[in-house]
Amino acid sequence: MKRIYLALCALLLLLGTGSRPAAAYPYYAQMAYDNPREATGKIVCANCHLNAMPARAEVPQAVTPGQVFTIKVGIPYDLSKQQVLADGSKGGLNVGAVVVLPEGFRLATEEEMTEEQRQETAETYITPYSDEKPNILLVGPLPGEQHQEIVFPVVAPDPKEDPSVAFMKYRVYIGANRGRGQINPDGSLSNNNVFRAPATGRLTSIATIESDLSDLPPELAALVPPEYELPGTRVLSFETEGGLKHLVVPPGPELVVNIGDSVQEGDPVTNNPNVGGFGQVERDLVLQNPERVKWLVAFLAAVAITQLLLVLKKKQVELIQAAELLG
């Protein structure tokens, strides 16, 4: 089942943005990590989405066993921005999110949700991270224009049924990304990056793929990796002290150097096309014992009644004292 699901994700990947999208796909984490949250607390989406952007989250302060509640994740960004797609063209940003719940908490089924909750989640397909980690929820990619906020329906566990769960305060870890990443799952760079000079020297030539790889001289064509074999890919040649050096720049990033320009190693030779980024927040969530709530309500009621009786007793004493003075 998992293989079928990953295949579906790959199909969406291909249809959505080209051959190597590095998009807002939290599912990429499933391919490389057993747990999307590292020991340091960092959610691994940040390893591919290198730019930091805000994430917002609304989490209830407290819930009771069996309660179906919602966690709302906000993914704000400038809707006028467009990102560079895998083929170098411009398009809208996709968004995705991951919610790391305490163990025992899980995604609510449609039957468990209220009508309002079903409507809030009707256009989102949320899945557990894996069969072993049903407490970690993923969603995305989704069109960012329609999904500035994503709602996760969650069921709270019952410590009476699950001894591993206790009535206590927990932490919820939430990550939200928008736009394509800078690192592909295999570790290669996507075209949503700044490309830099490989060595100190002078730019001597720029060869461009107009239609296919045959547009380049054979010695340059051999340098182009398969994922960059696209119209618009450029091969920059630099004259350096160590001989001729080359840099392959995929379509999308715009060159900021011209033939004849001198560069230092590490200097940017393109602009930074990235307009997206990843954000992470943490929230407290209390699993409340309903029996304690009942006793608390009873205690508060007793305190209120006691205070009322004291007030009445005081009034009674005042009336007696007034009568004695008049008598």
From Swiss-Prot:
Record-level GO BP terms: photosynthesis
Residues annotated as transmembrane: 293-313
Cofactor field: heme
Keywords on record: Electron transport, Heme, Iron, Membrane, Metal-binding, Photosynthesis, Signal, Thylakoid, Transmembrane, Transmembrane helix, Transport
An example Gene Ontology CC term for this record: plasma membrane-derived thylakoid membrane
Residues that coordinate or bind heme: 25, 45, 48-49
Cellular location(s): Cellular thylakoid membrane
Coiled-coil region: none
GO molecular function: electron transfer activity; heme binding; iron ion binding
Record Pfam families: Apocytochr_F_C (PF01333), Apocytochr_F_N (PF16639)
Membrane topology: Single-pass membrane protein
Positions of disulphide bridges: none
Co-factor remark: Binds 1 heme group covalently.
Subunit-level organization: The 4 large subunits of the cytochrome b6-f complex are cytochrome b6, subunit IV (17 kDa polypeptide, PetD), cytochrome f and the Rieske protein, while the 4 small subunits are PetG, PetL, PetM and PetN. The complex functions as a dimer.
Biological function: Component of the cytochrome b6-f complex, which mediates electron transfer between photosystem II (PSII) and photosystem I (PSI), cyclic electron flow around PSI, and state transitions.
UniProt similarity note: Belongs to the cytochrome f family.
Name this protein carries in UniProt: Cytochrome f
Species the sequence originates in: Synechococcus sp. (strain JA-3-3Ab) (Cyanobacteria bacterium Yellowstone A-Prime)
